[in-house]
Amino acid sequence: EKYSPDAWMLNYSNPAAIVAEATRRLRPNSRIINICDMPVALENIMANILNLESRKEMIVKYYGLNHFGWWTSITDKAGKDLMPELKAFVKEKGYAKETEDYQHRAQSWKDTYLMAKDVYALDPETVPNTYLKYYLLQDEVVEHSNKEYTRANEVMDSREKEVFDTAKGIIEKGSAEGYTFAVGAHATFIVDLACALAFNTKERMLLIVPNNGAISNFDPEAMVEIPCLVGSNGPEPLAVGKIPEFQKGLMEQQVAVEKLTVDAWMEHSYLKLWQALTLSKTVPSAKIAKKILDELIEANKEYWPELS
């Protein structure tokens, strides 16, 4: 804002939904675009299922919150409806298509892709984001989780270790010769976004933006993940219209969690954070929410403000 007021900040920071809500309130005049590559990664899988060369052959309609959304329409550029074929696959196998890339995935991802079929069953009119399993299939997720070795441990022992070890090797060698990095959705998406801003391409992209009526029957202030056309003036959100009661109810509850979390940080409020955790569909009761909160405070006391 002070030194480069015309610059765009492309923000991948997690937890993306809460960070987006915080930037909306605390930095309303900054040119921040909040993004997540999860929908893009899933669209790559969808394109593979549909035997397309690229996800960019698809025109998608999608709405929701970050890690909390649904595809309502997917066509090719000629207008052919691709949803029936995709739904038939997801109904039987989720997003678990046997490919070379799939074979190299961690087991937790394979389980996640397969569980999408159970999430899909709740609304066969759409296809879901995989992360909805945490909000709709909580018992099953907990039952198959190892509290001694969580998803975070898996990431630290695999992707994070590989990246850091490679970076250390390059530094020690003084050269990147002989090293290779795979370019995935995380990298290509942010480059596509930067190019759209720089060259006014008007590319259609899924971004996290203020609703402002795009979803007509939803909180206008909520940060929603919807298609936008991106050019040199930034994102232009596309109208979604009215959404079904099932998704609306889920999203309203989750937005309340996100807003209360930001309230808690701004006000240093123990009560607001307890309320946020109690509202989360990943937490079964207020009593357990309080226990989780107290353990989170202890684990993060070096980083969190003091709550009262």
Feature map (PLM): residue ranges:
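Rossmann-like NAD(P)(H) cofactor-binding subdomain of soluble oxidoreductases
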Residues: 1-26, 31-37, 43
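Short, flexible loop segments at boundaries between secondary-structure elements
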Residues: 39-51
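Long, compositionally biased stretches enriched for glycine and/or charged residues
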Residues: 48-308
